[in-house]
A protein has these predicted regions:
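P-loop NTP-binding module
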Residues: 1-180
Length: 180
């Protein structure tokens, strides 16, 4: 499952992290959270660690996956972090080595849920190039920021990927408007 957004700052990474934690706590599967926002890797910051190695080290230098995985202290949750921003991220994300890595991660265990934190769809072509390699996507939109045009364009970029739905983030619904 890919988690992405139309633009930057809409909360896709925090949504991916919270979803990963929730799934690890609620289901009987392990959860692997992979930081593929290689231009701005930040999943590790949500857990308060600075990785020595990241996904790019696996793809570009052949570092074994087991040497990059981080266990953040939550049962059944494992993180494959990014590390430092990567300028040529779209080439890395579409490389044969990356695609083989994704297939290996997806099929490594039948009881594993794999979440990919992808870059925003409208910021670069990274997420658009990678989206066909996931089973489904979740689109995060920020209330009051994401325009209808941006949402339409983002959904269009995901037309060849099953879109499970959208997450309305940073909503400021008033208590007065809420009732049972």
């Amino acid at each position: 499952l890919a988690v992405t957004s139309a633009g930057p700052g809409e909360g896709k990474t925090l949504t991916a992290v919270n979803l990963a934690i929730s799934l690890a706590r609620e289901v009987n599967h392990t959860v692997l959270l992979v930081d593929l926002d290689l231009r701005n890797p930040s999943v590790h910051e949500c857990f308060g660690f600075q990785p020595e190695r990241g996904v790019a080290d696996i793809v570009l230098q052949g570092v074994p996956v087991s040497e990059v995985l981080i266990h953040p202290g939550i049962d059944r949750l494992v993180v494959l972090p990014g590390r430092e921003p990567l300028a040529h991220s779209s080439e890395v994300l579409s490389s044969p080595v990356m695609l083989a890595l994704v297939q290996a991660l997806k099929h490594r265990s039948a009881n594993r849920i794999v979440l990919f934190d992808l870059p925003p769809l409208l910021s670069a072509d990274d997420a658009v190039a990678f989206a066909p390699h996931v089973d489904a996507a979740l689109l995060v939109v920020e209330e009051g920021k994401t325009t209808r045009d941006e949402l339409t364009r983002a959904v269009g970029y995901l037309r060849n990927t099953e879109l499970l739905g959208t997450v309305l983030n940073k909503s400021e619904e008033s208590v007065a408007g809420y009732y049972y």
